[in-house]
Amino acid sequence: MEQNKCALVTGSSRGVGKAAAIRLAENGYNIVINYARSKKAALETAEEIEKLGVKVLVVKANVGQPAKIKEMFQQIDETFGRLDVFVNNAASGVLRPVMELEETHWDWTMNINAKALLFCAQEAAKLMEKNGGGHIVSISSLGSIRYLENYTTVGVSKAALEALTRYLAVELSPKQIIVNAVSGGAIDTDALKHFPNREDLLEDARQNTPAGRMVEIKDMVDTVEFLVSSKADMIRGQTIIVDGGRSLLV
């Protein structure tokens, strides 16, 4: 019997990460759930996924720390011996005006949102190439290409993530590893609750999205599912914007 493929989704205890992990499990992947603080939510997600008949590994790791990344991938190798899909979803950030930002705010955000992709991708590639390749998909946001209030650290980190996606796509292609990103418009998740202007963002999305509705978690996950399929093999180094057309109206 063919061994189940394995997918790692960072920051997968809730929101888009949780939904992506569940979708991949529905497609038969064994799942690695990663969390930094939400242990209870991570275990609940694992229990939900196990009911789908696949194996689950839960790993606590702050992906902003390369040493923790190495430990996480060592656990993946020991448990599953392979990795086929890596969804780089974990994100954090300090939401303040430019003049109020401190070095610690910058470093925290860049480490988790940008540096993590590089060092996770290095470790993921080592496992993926043993089984003929794989897919890496990162989650970005529109703040990478347009101004959002108090979003400086996150926006810059997501711009770095998208640039790194292009470099990884070229350099990992010889290993048959396909790298892309998905950038979403405003989605009503737990993460958005940290925004002081949350209601303004949601109302803007409701009123000014050409598609006539807000982007939902399912829309993001549908795109991730497509990008890790063979149907998307000729899409490389791209950031697919899933915003219902909102970014077209400036």
Curated annotation (Swiss-Prot):
Q: What induces it?
A: Expressed during exponential growth.
Q: What class of enzyme is it?
A: oxidoreductase
Q: Which InterPro entries match?
A: NAD(P)-bd_dom_sf, SDR_fam
Q: Which domain of life is it from?
A: Bacteria
**Binding of NADP(+): at which residues?**
S13, R14, G15, V16, A36, R37, S38, N62, V63, N89, K158, I187, D188, T189
Annotated GO biological process:
fatty acid elongation
The reaction(s) annotated as catalysed by this protein in its Swiss-Prot or TrEMBL entry are: a 2,3-saturated acyl-[ACP] + NADP(+) = a (2E)-enoyl-[ACP] + NADPH + H(+); (2E)-butenoyl-[ACP] + NADPH + H(+) = butanoyl-[ACP] + NADP(+)
Its Gene Ontology molecular function terms?
enoyl-[acyl-carrier-protein] reductase (NADH) activity; enoyl-[acyl-carrier-protein] reductase (NADPH) activity; NADP binding; oxidoreductase activity, acting on the CH-OH group of donors, NAD or NADP as acceptor
| Keywords in alphabetical order | Fatty acid biosynthesis, Fatty acid metabolism, Lipid biosynthesis, Lipid metabolism, NADP, Oxidoreductase
Per UniProt, activity regulation is: Inhibited by triclosan.
* Phenotype reported upon loss of the gene: Cells lacking this gene exhibit a 250-fold decrease in the triclosan MIC.
Q: What is its EC number?
A: 1.3.1.104
Identify the metabolic or biological route this protein is part of.
Lipid metabolism; fatty acid biosynthesis
Show the CDD domains listed in the entry: ChcA_like_SDR_c
Catalytic residue list: Y151 (proton acceptor), K158 (proton acceptor)
Q: How does it assemble?
A: Homotetramer.
* Family from the record: Belongs to the short-chain dehydrogenases/reductases (SDR) family.
Q: Which PANTHER family match?
A: OXIDOREDUCTASE, SHORT-CHAIN DEHYDROGENASE/REDUCTASE FAMILY (AFU_ORTHOLOGUE AFUA_5G02870), SHORT-CHAIN DEHYDROGENASE_REDUCTASE FAMILY PROTEIN
User: According to its UniProt entry, what is the function of this protein?
Assistant: Catalyzes the reduction of a carbon-carbon double bond in an enoyl moiety that is covalently linked to an acyl carrier protein (ACP). It confers resistance to triclosan.
The protein here is known as Enoyl-[acyl-carrier-protein] reductase [NADPH] FabL
